[in-house]
Amino acid sequence: MKRILLLLMSVFIAAAVFSQDRVRAYLVSNAHFDSQWNWDVQRSIREYIPKTLDQNLFLLGTYPDYVFNFEGGIKYQWMKEYYPHQYELIKRYIREGRWHVTGSTWDATDPNIPSAESFTRNILYGQHFYRREFGVEGTDIFLPDCFGFGWTLPTIAAHSGLIGFSTQKLMWRHRPFHGTSKIPFEIGLWQGVDGSRIMAVMDAHNYTTKWRYEDLSHSKYLQDIAQSNPLNAVYHYYGTGDTGGAPTIESVRALELGLQGDGPVEIISATSDRLYKDYLPYSSHPELPVWNGELLMDVHATGCYTSQAAMKLYNRRNEQLADAAERSAVAADWLGAVPYPREVLTEAWKRFIWHQFHDDLTGTSLPRAYEFSWNDELISLKQFGDVLTTSVGAVSRGLDTDVKGLPVVLYNAAGFEVSDVVEVTLPLEGSKFTVYDDKGVRVPSQVLGTQQGQTRLLVEATVPAAGYAVYDIRKGGQPKAPAIKAGAWGLENSVYKLTLDANGDISSIVDKRHGRELVAAGKSIRLAFFPQNESYSWPAWEILKKTVDASPQAITGEVKVTVAEEGPLRASVCVERTLGDSRFRQWITLREGAQADRIDLVNDIDWQSSNALLKAEFPLSVSNLSLIHISEPT
């Protein structure tokens, strides 16, 4: 009897010790799906959406332990619109917890170019769609293939109620960034700029991993990775990319075999958030390391933030116009002028923010893809513009515009009072005008020109935060003499004296208030030309360090400087140059009044150079750290 008891006790003790020695492997299936890249959205909908649906529905129906993770609200929307039968089938698997809605966003956004408002709305619209369609919400940021991750990501994610983040892209780095490692750790906590924290998997391993048919519970590979970190756990993608689809049948069979295995690795067929939930609350796990900083790339990020500049322009204009439209619409609704256009604004936001996808806004898709991207961007601009015009017009009709001359209503969408020089187009011709504010005080103005019964007029105006101001414009009066000096030598107003060199570059800016030179000694503010960027594998992604370390060429061909505009409120010079077959026109502008301390440089470039770079250089003698500063590795 004693022998039996001793034997049982030894078995129990051995089992307990074995259990503690086991490591965990969270195997996270995925079908990485670039909405656009080397194909356009039409092909994604026609080929890659049905492939993803059919292959995963087969696996889900055949292998009871298979769990599939898939992200991107816009892709689910395409499923609903174009493949309604399969869409209804995946709803059942979502209810069963086997098809997992991951990522939380409307699409897998680039986290660096979009504004914080856009990033937040990407999550907002994704979550709203998931709640409405499936009765669930995502809990994580799932970005296997993005080109670096800004420090704001964990803050935005945490304030959106999300708990985790994963990627595998950081291992693409060329150089180590953290001692001898490319990442600060494999699994831990990432702290945002405000102290918020989410769990972060910084190396989830290759998302196209395919398992061989073997008992994964005995995998030395998984065991070694898990034992290399203090959690004794590994989070590992497996599946396919970049055109959707599903993991291989052999991979899923290996997963099922491993789930039944008795080896030192506990296999978990995991949703993308299972690891994060297992470690909540994070404050109870002091073994989790913490990273407090950015996660940047030295490859696949150094060029894509300048590629396809039109996309960046349209995106930023949409972000700005969306904010203005939203503010004006809320005020108009509150004042009873016009109902709040919720559906129009939501549609416009969703139409352009899916193009913030990491191969779209970044400029790394093929040219045909941008025909669809630009189209959507322009439609959203039109929708936001219509909302802004309608809302401002409705409120303006209720304002007191009983003035002696022509009333002009100005609207300020910013959340603070703005004093600026405003350009107004009047429906009448004239060479002399006087302008008065709502208190009857004359304000500075400047006629720019007349054409076809209209006059372009500059007015120095002040408009309250998110508010309106009425100005009275009358014909006649004595125009003021120009207060800004302009010539081929440069420009001068009450704040700055700006001098051009023989190339038309800005060689000096003297701040007259403080008697200080703002341009670094021996330098000039200029356009600089780099003739070769020898990135042949990833030309849209990369600007090589050796390219920008080289000395650039000055642009000095056929330099011509003319005075483009001169008046009491604004003056500008136009600098024309050539380099090879490329032609450059640059307008340098100074103002007077509230914006006298502002210098504008606007470039119009006919670019005829290939495999080359153009850089705007601003070598200043002063710096502004603003709120925080970030130390970068050299």
Give each language-model segment a name:
Residues F119-W151, I156-H159, K220-Y237:
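CE4/NodB-like, metal-dependent polysaccharide N-deacetylase domain
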Residues P111-F129, A204-A226, A571:
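Alpha-helical scaffold elements lining the catalytic groove of polysaccharide deacetylases
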Residues Q20-N122, F129-R132, H159-L162, L189:
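N-terminal catalytic cores of secreted or lumenal carbohydrate-active enzymes
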Residues L89-G97, E117, G150-T209:
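Surface-exposed loop and adjacent secondary-structure segments within mature catalytic domains
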